[in-house]
């Protein structure tokens, strides 16, 4: 019998064997103790593997969720909450009780939880890799390459110089030097999946800073993987073994990219064609490939998550593969198993065993590498002419760490690369630095500030200054197109008053990590979202062809989390100098007028756009699907349009838009002006500064009505909100479209009693009434964005049209006084 076998026998006789996972000693136990017989038969469920694992998972998930709720106001992420949950449940806090440890974390109960959580983790890492578009490395740009390189090179190089200095100055033991070198490699890295996760949680993934941080992180991670792979391979005993291991791992990556990737793509395309349904994926074959690659990784001496991650990277992100696999696997891997895996790092953390010998030196090196990373990123950003606030925010984002770094810490601790002291310090510092960085980024960076710093563009300004009318139309699906085309037709594009239209297809980000905002022609032709975008674009292009020379359209697609996609809307509106953003209402109506579907995410988008938009915003309540489908094919438009006017900036904006509709020779426009009885009294005093522009606008509409028989002005005298409601209810189905302002003077007697309740405050008091199922016409609720615009201030004075029943060819907003030329209204189409 060999010496090794003899030691094993002696160990078993002492009641212990070498553990199969962490190379530690374990107490021998019966291997059939899996499920309990039940407490009624005298069995203790927590002595069995299955009940104990279920208890551990339940407690970990519940604790991490509670901590996340508590820390959410401080902008902390789920990963931080999960690590804290492990620390609280582990030996650092609750684990000080030996009875608790024997019940909740016995030695025999660790392996089952760790094995299952590792399974979930490598599936999660596969999903993270799946969301990565490897092509963005080529698209990163010189700025991102410079910043990403500086973010990795400075902490890595200065950190190692610090190690040489400490080694020679303090005569550090070799194991401590080796541990510190490992710390430097870890802290120098910035993981692309972690960065995009942080950006998404902070709702800045599709902001300018978010896109730059995304590109910088993938450049930094490319360096990290190269160094980590070489470091991992050449730690082996024996040079030849290290070389062979490196060769075989490289061969595995080549097999993944040049064998597995083409095979999976071929299977996906073949299945989609055979069942004639886009989006279907060969789920079972992909899972078998994933398990095989993960097993091969373990055989070659690297973690199963390594092969899983690179398999994910090799596959196309987004639909159908990215979206389909994410939908099927994310709940199990991310929501159920990942909290257990992350919490295990906290369970292994013990504050009470941190010694005093080299703690200060190790912590100093950790902080130095973080500081070098921050300074390197900030300096490179300043060199690239990035504003100082954004440069600091970017540097803080590059210092954030998460699941990849935690996995690396746990793996190196298990392999004895990191000692317990170093592991504890890394986890604690990671929590503190990431938590502080996230909070400071929220304080320093506000993507909407670039919108607020600009002067606002309004419809009133466009009319007064004779500017081109520029519309940004947001659509989610093909069903939104017909009524949007109706709205364009009603807006009456003409040779002397053309319209520039920018359509934006909004797609919720699924199956990919980075947000995109691109012109339609740059979309991936194999992406199912491109197919839907093409159908949307075709509808608008058909209308554009019917109005050549009077309407020019550009088409864009934005894929981003719905929590922050409002930044794409506002960015495009700012870049294209849009006058009005039109966004669909979050409720969809059936043919009979009842609410068919409600999407709370769309409502949040609308609220964010209303708050941050650089121009006027219109929320469109679409009830004209049947008629709308005819608009694309038959140039059908609404025949009867009403505008509700009470008072205020938004009502004036709605009236200005309706006056453009009134130019259409085939559309009848009725202005319904609500006035209180007191306003008719001769001694009624008005605020001249606030109502002067309204008076000019109303008089202008009245004069326009005198020259066009299809334009009418109707005055309704009411005493309170009850009579206002009665008048509105009497509208019935007389109109195809009603245009109304969002905000009014809430103290107005016209609205008395109506302001106490509102289901949808984003529509205002009157708009909220129109959203009920009692009405069957479409509604456009317009909000004039507050800001430094000409509209509704003292400088805005639309010239009063001459008192004439006059020439119908003369456009009411053109006059000799303003230096404009009269145009022929009936021959300019």
UniProtKB/Swiss-Prot annotation:
One of its GO terms (molecular function) is antiporter activity. It is found in: Membrane. Gene3D superfamilies: 1.20.1530.20, 3.40.50.12370. GO terms for cellular component: membrane. Its main location: membrane. Belongs to the monovalent cation:proton antiporter 2 (CPA2) transporter (TC 2.A.37) family. CHX (TC 2.A.37.4) subfamily. May operate as a cation/H(+) antiporter. This is Cation/H(+) antiporter 14. It comes from Arabidopsis thaliana.
């Amino acid at each position: 019998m060999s010496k090794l076998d003899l030691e094993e026998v002696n160990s078993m006789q002492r009641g212990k064997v070498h553990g199969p996972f962490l190379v530690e000693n374990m107490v021998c136990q019966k291997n059939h103790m899996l499920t309990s017989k039940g407490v009624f038969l005298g069995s203790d469920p927590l002595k069995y593997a299955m009940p104990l694992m279920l208890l551990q998972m339940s407690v970990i998930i519940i604790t991490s969720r509670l901590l996340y709720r508590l820390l959410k106001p401080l902008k902390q992420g789920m990963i931080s909450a999960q690590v804290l949950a492990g620390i609280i449940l582990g030996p650092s806090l609750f684990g000080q009780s030996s009875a608790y440890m024997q019940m909740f974390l016995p030695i025999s109960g660790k392996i089952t939880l760790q094995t299952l959580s590792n399974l979930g983790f490598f599936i999660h890492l596969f999903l993270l890799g799946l969301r990565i578009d490897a092509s963005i490395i080529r698209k990163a740009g010189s700025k991102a390459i410079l910043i990403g390189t500086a973010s990795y090179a400075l902490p890595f190089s200065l950190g190692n110089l610090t190690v040489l200095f400490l080694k020679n100055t303090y005569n550090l033991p070799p194991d401590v030097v080796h541990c510190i070198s490992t710390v430097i490699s870890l802290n120098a890295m910035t993981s692309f999946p972690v960065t995009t996760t942080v950006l998404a949680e902070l709702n800045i993934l599709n902001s300018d800073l978010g896109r730059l941080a995304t590109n910088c992180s993938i450049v930094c991670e490319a360096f990290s993987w190269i160094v980590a792979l070489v470091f991992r391979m050449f730690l082996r005993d024996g040079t030849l073994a290290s070389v062979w291991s490196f060769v075989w791992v490289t061969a595995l990556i080549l097999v993944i990219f040049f064998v597995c990737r083409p095979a999976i793509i071929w299977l996906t395309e073949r299945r989609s064609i055979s069942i004639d349904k886009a989006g279907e994926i060969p789920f079972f074959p992909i899972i078998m490939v994933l398990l095989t690659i993960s097993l091969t990784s373990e055989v070659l001496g690297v973690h199963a998550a390594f092969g899983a991650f690179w398999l994910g990277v090799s596959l196309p992100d987004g639909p159908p593969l990215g979206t389909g696999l994410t939908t099927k696997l994310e709940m199990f891997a991310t929501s159920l198993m990942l909290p257990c895996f992350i919490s295990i790092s906290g369970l292994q953390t013990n504050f009470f065993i941190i010694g005093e010998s080299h703690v200060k030196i190790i912590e100093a090196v950790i902080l130095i590498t973080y500081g070098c990373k921050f300074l390197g990123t900030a300096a490179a950003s300043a060199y690239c002419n990035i504003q100082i606030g954004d440069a600091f925010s970017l540097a803080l984002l590059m210092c954030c760490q998460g699941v990849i770094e935690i996995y690396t810490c746990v793996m190196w601790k298990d392999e004895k690369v990191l000692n317990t002291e170093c592991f504890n310090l890394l986890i604690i510092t990671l929590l503190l630095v990431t938590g502080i960085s996230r909070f400071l980024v929220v304080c320093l960076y506000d993507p909407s500030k670039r919108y607020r710093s600009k002067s606002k563009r309004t419809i009133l300004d466009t009319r007064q200054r004779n500017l081109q009318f520029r519309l940004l139309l947001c659509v989610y699906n093909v069903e939104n197109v017909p009524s949007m085309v109706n709205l364009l037709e009603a807006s009456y594009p003409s040779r002397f008053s053309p319209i520039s239209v920018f359509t934006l297809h909004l797609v919720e980000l699924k199956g990919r990590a980075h947000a995109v905002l691109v012109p339609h022609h740059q979309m991936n032709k194999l992406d199912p979202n491109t197919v839907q975008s093409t159908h949307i674009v075709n509808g608008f292009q058909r209308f554009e062809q019917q109005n050549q020379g009077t309407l020019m359209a550009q088409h864009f697609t934005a894929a981003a989390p719905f929590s922050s996609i409002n930044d794409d809307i506002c960015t495009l509106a700012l870049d294209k100098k849009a006058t009005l953003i039109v966004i669909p209402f979050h409720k969809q109506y059936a043919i009979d007028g009842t609410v068919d579907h409600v999407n709370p995410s769309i409502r949040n988008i609308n609220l964010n756009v209303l708050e941050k938009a650089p121009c006027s915003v219109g929320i469109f309540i679409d009830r004209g699907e049947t008629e709308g489908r005819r608009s694309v094919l038959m140039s059908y438009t609404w025949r009867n349009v009403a505008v509700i006017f009470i008072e205020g900036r938004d009502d004036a904006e709605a009236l200005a838009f309706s006056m453009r509709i009134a130019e259409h020779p085939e559309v009848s426009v009725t202005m319904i002006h609500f006035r209180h009885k007191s306003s008719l009294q001769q001694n009624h005093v008005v605020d001249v500064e606030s109502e002067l522009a309204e008076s000019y606008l109303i008089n202008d509409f009245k004069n326009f009505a005198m020259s066009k028989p299809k334009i009418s002005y109707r005055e309704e005298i009411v005493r309170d909100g009850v009579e206002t409601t009665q008048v509105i209810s009497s509208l019935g189905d007389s109109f195809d479209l009603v245009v109304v302002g969002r905000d009014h003077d809430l103290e107005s007697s016209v609205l008395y009693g109506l302001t106490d309740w509102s289901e949808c405050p984003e529509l205002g008091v009157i708009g909220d009434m129109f959203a009920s199922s009692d009405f069957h016409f479409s509604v456009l609720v317009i909000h004039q964005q507050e800001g430094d615009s000409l509209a509704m201030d003292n400088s805005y004075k639309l010239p009063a049209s001459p008192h004439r029943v006059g020439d119908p060819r003369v456009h009411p907003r053109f006059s000799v006084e303003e230096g404009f030329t009269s145009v022929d209204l009936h021959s300019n189409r």
